[in-house]
Design a protein with these regions (language model features):
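ER/Golgi luminal nucleotide-sugar-dependent glycosyltransferases, focusing on the catalytic module
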Residues: 1-133
Length: 133
């Protein structure tokens, strides 16, 4: 059975998202994941879309993907929807209750969610493009 494994997103931080506590060393994780799939399936193709441009060589060397895209996260800025597009035009009214930290956290979470799903869709898109070529 042939298997396609799609990796996407940004390398996580040691103490949370967005590189908090410094970025993780993903070498061991990549090797374990690759070994798991390669040992279980005879024919595995890897595809990668990642915001971790600085990890491009490492990821490509370990996974040897059929296709990969590494790009800065800022490429999606013009595609992001605003809070108002999701009916959250009154988010400022929550400041009195939760303070500015809530709004800042919400904006970061909102950007993260859109980035995640964009990257997920790009990894599937490059897999599809490869399979159609």
């Amino acid at each position: 059975m042939k298997l396609a494994v799609c990796f996407y997103g940004n390398v996580g931080g040691k103490k949370g998202s967005h590189g908090h506590g410094g970025y993780q060393d993903i070498t061991e994780h990549l090797i374990k994941n690759k070994n798991h799939f390669d040992n279980k399936y005879k024919d595995v193709d890897y595809f990668v879309h990642s915001w971790s441009v600085d990890k491009k060589d490492l990821i490509n060397n370990v996974l040897n993907p059929k296709s990969s895209i590494f790009e800065e996260n800022s490429v999606i800025n013009d595609q992001l929807k605003s809070l108002e597009d999701y009916g959250l035009r009154n988010i400022n009214s929550y400041e009195n209750m939760f303070g500015n930290e809530f709004k800042d956290f919400f904006k970061i979470s909102f950007f993260s969610a859109q980035s995640r799903w964009y990257s997920n869709s790009k990894s599937l898109e490059i897999m599809k493009n490869y399979s159609n070529s």
